Amino acid sequence: AVLPQIGTPPPLLREHRLYQADWLLRFYGFQAGELLSPEKPDFNELVDPKCDWALRHLDQFPVGVGTADYAVLLRVPGIGPKSAGRIVNARRYGRLDFPSLKKMGVVLKRAHYFITCQGKQMYHTPIEENYIIRQLVHTDKKELWETQHANESFSQMTLADFGIR
């Protein structure tokens, strides 16, 4: 990736992706070498770093939520620490299904590509990187938005914008 020139702020999306990656390192048990490598030194800007990791490791998916341990569940896009803990606890009392996962806080919009319940996927979808990215990003909507807002520029708000000094 090209670094911004001295004195110019980094692009907001790049900054946001770095914050997300930092979160993965601190709270999700990822190592820096897992997220980026010499072969893949940049994040995919279309998806968050956790989803980017999952898409590069499709051989480890889908994960059966009925048997996967906490550390494995944490690596599934759409499942955070609270949801992973709830899944592990709920398995003691019975079998899990997709509606119960949703109630536990799992973001099925992202997670359903990477998990199974009772050996079945939520929808019959191919486990292919390009297919999943297209579904997650809704490329048509992004291109439409970019076309409609081509002449606009956006910047991060500061406290001064709210009258706070």
Where are these regions (language model features)?
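C-terminal extensions
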Residues: 42-72, 98-165
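Adenosine-cofactor binding site in Rossmann-like domains, unifying the SAM/SAH pocket
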Residues: 95
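C-terminal scaffold of the Radical SAM
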Residues: 1-63, 67-71, 77
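Residue-level signature of tetratricopeptide-repeat
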Residues: 90-91
